[in-house]
Amino acid sequence: YRILSSVQENVFFNGYLSHYAEVVNRISAKVTKVEGNSARHEATFMVTESTSGRQNEIPVWGEEYPSVFMRDELGTYDIEKKYFMPVVRDVPIFPRRDVKVGESWTAEGHEAHDMRRSFDIQEPWIVPFSAHYTYTGTVKEEGRTLHVIEGRYNIYYDSPTVKDRASLTSDLPATTMGFSHQTLYWDNHKGALSRYNEEFRIVIETVFGNTFEFQGVAQAEVSDFVAPSVEKIP
């Protein structure tokens, strides 16, 4: 399957608008193995970013990220620390029961951010959260029935690695705050998301007292979904 996602965001530094950015992520993924209730996904994320409104403007930046992960029937990821993609993981997570329209539930998830360029952090920067979901009903799109889920989570995370701030010689994220409001369109026949829309705001406060703020919208759509013939291990 393939996913095309895009982000449009304003980026602020210490309260002042730094620049506007548009990030496009072209994802190609394949399910290569099924083990019990989990499936192995092998994916390539091709990310390009264009910016405007900054003095040292970089018209287009791009990078390719490989990723391999297991995801179970409820949506939980099992992924090695070396992989930077996907950014949002364990969304959505379903309960172990049938969900009725109007019903809500909560589940843990996390975001994984690439901080190599900003802070020289060589592993994904993991930010946990607790998400609240509500199943709001169904919609018809191109003859398909999609199940609509509203997902929301707030973030407030103090980094455990920067407690001894006086000994630090380089800036690092100290506190990450923000929110994400998502509308998820789930295709029950395929057992996967069909598309989603998101509004978000993320603020990172650093050890040296700087703030980076990202606010904007995102959207993604799955295409070329093919039911593969994969190796199945009981």
Predicted regions and their residues:
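Acidic, serine/threonine-rich low-complexity disordered tracts
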Residues: 1-63, 112-234
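Short, positively charged
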Residues: 72-79, 162-167
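Disulfide-stabilized netrin-like
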Residues: 63-67, 71-75
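Short, structured beta-strand/loop micro-motifs enriched in basic residues and often containing a Trp
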Residues: 67, 81-91
